Amino acid sequence: KFHAYFPTANSYPAIVADMLSGAIACIGFTWIASPACTELEVAMLDWLGKMLELPAEFLACSGGKGGGVIQGTASEATLVALLGAKAKKMKEVRETHPDWDDHTIISKLVGYSSAQAHSSVERAGLLGGVKLRSVPADEQNRLRGEALEKAIEQDLADGLIPFYAVVTLGTTNSCAFDRLDECGPVANKHNVWVHVDAAYAGSAFICPEYRHLMKGIETADSFNFNPHKWMLVNFDCSAMWLKDPSWVVNAFNVDPLYLKHDMQGSAPDYRHWQIPIGRRFRALKLWFVLRLYGVENLQAHIRRHCTYAQQFAELCVQDSRFELAAEVNMGLVCFRLKGSNERNEALLKRINGRGKIHLVPAKIRDVYFLRMAVCSRFTRPEDMEYSWQEVSAAADEEEQQQK
């Protein structure tokens, strides 16, 4: 009955694996520090990538440059991708403008994201010391290729250097899907790094019926989603794939004598793929969950949540006082009382004040609405009915008070 934010997953296999990881107590910053920690992570990211049907260029088993890494959060992945893109673009600009210093180049760099992108994208820009431009979304809250092209062309005309674009698949406000199939080719044409943020919705791509939403993934340079949101792996476990990790590795490469070893170059040292140096044995819980649940059970879990969201949406539209504020995607329903924002603010305060269910709001184009996310693996159809009854009862109380 906790329906705020997006899910934070857990399961008994993941909990046991986390306990075992704590007992093993390895700090897997290099291969030599814990070969199993590194090797299992390489294997698990390949397993997971195959479940999503990611292009082979992202997978270590392809024999190419690509590979995956487990970050702590999608916020970290967004920043890591930005810093890799920044390093790549600065190298390119130095070759064409050898007289420009780093400060001059950095001052001209500009990145892009939808106005509906997560706040962590803006934060990555602040931490990376670069400008990020918010591009208006369309009426369905999606970033479109035409809008991105227009923004890039304008910045090029102003003497700026486009270097990075974040395409969101499953926005936080309304679970909208940017048009990767349009934005990717535009970014590729201008040699702009494409990072795909699918933090919540990415788990659904293990189901074939949802993979059309990631059409154009072959145009991306990096892709990220959080198994710890919707795939029964407890926090923290954020999967990230890179087509060419060398840009990130070279950007982060600090190699003191005490971390050197004879196997460098033959296996990844994941300390070069992330912001921290030390890292937990996070691949263990991913392995436990994949082995004990299997793909079909994980798919069934995703599909149940999507069905429950549709059930709640149907209950909502059957009440003439309410309306849907956005298309129902995945396990999220955006709804509101017809009328003013103030009415909906009062309704949310009353719902949460009753203490039976918990929701959070969002606002798009100055329209305030409530978000109902299916969060628990224990949720059943009767819970959706109960939650709707709570919403309806709170609306009744609010109407009585207004009389």
Swiss-Prot record:
InterPro entries: Aromatic_deC, PyrdxlP-dep_de-COase, PyrdxlP-dep_Trfase, PyrdxlP-dep_Trfase_major, PyrdxlP-dep_Trfase_small, Pyridoxal-P_BS. Substrate binds at residues 8, 118. One of its GO terms (biological process) is serotonin biosynthetic process. It holds the Pfam family Pyridoxal_deC. It catalyses: L-dopa + H(+) = dopamine + CO2; 5-hydroxy-L-tryptophan + H(+) = serotonin + CO2. The keyword Lyase applies. Residues 250-276 are annotated as: Disordered. Its EC number is 4.1.1.28. Its cofactor is pyridoxal 5'-phosphate. GO terms for cellular component: cytoplasm. The active site is at residue 118. One of its GO terms (molecular function) is L-dopa decarboxylase activity. Pyridoxal 5'-phosphate binds at residues 74-75, 197, 226. The modification N6-(pyridoxal phosphate)lysine is found at residue 229. Keywords: Catecholamine biosynthesis, Decarboxylase, Lyase, Pyridoxal phosphate. Catalyzes the formation of serotonin more efficiently than dopamine. Displays no activity to tyrosine. Variation in the synthesis of bioamines may be a factor contributing to natural variation in life span. Homodimer. Belongs to the group II decarboxylase family. This is Aromatic-L-amino-acid decarboxylase. The lineage of its organism: Eukaryota, Metazoa, Ecdysozoa, Arthropoda, Hexapoda.
